[in-house]
Amino acid sequence: GLTQIDQDLQIGLMHAEYFAGIAKYDYGSISKNIDKNSAASFSFIRFGVDNIPNTTELIDAQGNVNYDRISYFTAADMAFLMSYGRKLNENLSVGGTAKIINRKAGDFANAWGFGFDFGAKYQLDSWKFAIMGKDITSTFNVWNYHLDDEMINHLYQSIDLFIEQYK
């Protein structure tokens, strides 16, 4: 756990790409011992897909295809994590993390959310036992949608076409 960092200050950075570079994952963290029994950490995570083609305006009102009307957007999740761990005695350590989450789907929608994790570790001789609770509150998100009338009309047309196809 966090109480076992072996230096007074630790910094971690990571970048990974998935699906031939389409999706990108970035992570950064800084951890610091507060005293001999406790430590704190601040972390940042971003997972996103950039340059997604927005084809909602590809076809104009007369049914003409115009590729110049394609725009691009990003869909990404970002999380800020604040963690704290404390060694209660030589055998027992506990800790927790509070997460603030921001989600964005282009200019169409965004959300703010939060979540909590906790953990405890007990060591008995050479045996180690641990328990973890991830997303104990679930990860609560409040979404805001930013759709203009034209976008809503496109959405209804797409739903109607889908229903007609599977009648």
Where in the sequence are the language-model features?
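Outer-membrane beta-barrel porins/channels
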Residues: D8, A16-A20, K24-K167
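Outer-membrane beta-barrel biogenesis signature
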Residues: G1-Q7
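A short mixed-secondary-structure module that forms the rim of ligand-binding clefts
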Residues: G12
